[in-house]
Amino acid sequence: MISATKIRSCLAACVLAAFGATGALADKATIPSESPFAAAEVADGAIVVDIAKMKYETPELHVKVGDTVTWINREAMPHNVHFVAGVLGEAALKGPMMKKEQAYSLTFTEAGTYDYHCTPHPFMRGKVVVE
């Protein structure tokens, strides 16, 4: 008789093989600044995702390889950008908490689809599609 543990292990291996586990986002993006910075420092024409009313205002964003995306928190509640990877949703990159009118940027260096959420508010979800 096959144990439940062996069945679960085999199932997990099959799922990972079928969908492929992605590497850490740190290998696919660069972080211009580890810390949040003032929203006033964001250049005109920048690709921006505003965070307001407990949501990412642009829940799905399409950009090109090499583009920098900046998230700006427009409300008093602190938020962050927490990317996940793989079919099990393991952490790939967790941005810092941003206070009101603070920003955080990532430059995407590899094509792919990158799902993210706010750590303290997991119902806040977004996606960056890099083409």
From Swiss-Prot:
Residues 27-131 form the Plastocyanin-like domain. SUPFAM superfamilies: Cupredoxins. Residues 1-26 form the signal peptide. Binds 1 copper ion per subunit. Keywords: Copper, Electron transport, Metal-binding, Periplasm, Signal, Transport. Pathway: One-carbon metabolism; methylamine degradation. GO terms for cellular component: periplasmic space. Its cofactor is Cu cation. It is found in: Periplasm. Its main location: periplasm. InterPro entries: Amicyanin, Amicyanin/Pseudoazurin, Amicyanin_Para/Methyl, BlueCu_1, BlueCu_1_BS, Copper_blue_Plastocyanin, Cupredoxin, ET_Amicyanin. GO terms for molecular function: copper ion binding; electron transfer activity. Cu cation binds at residues 79, 118, 121, 124. Primary acceptor of electrons from methylamine dehydrogenase. Passes those electrons on either a soluble cytochrome c or to pseudoazurin. This is Amicyanin. It comes from Paracoccus denitrificans. The lineage of its organism: Bacteria, Pseudomonadati, Pseudomonadota, Alphaproteobacteria, Rhodobacterales. The gene is mauC.
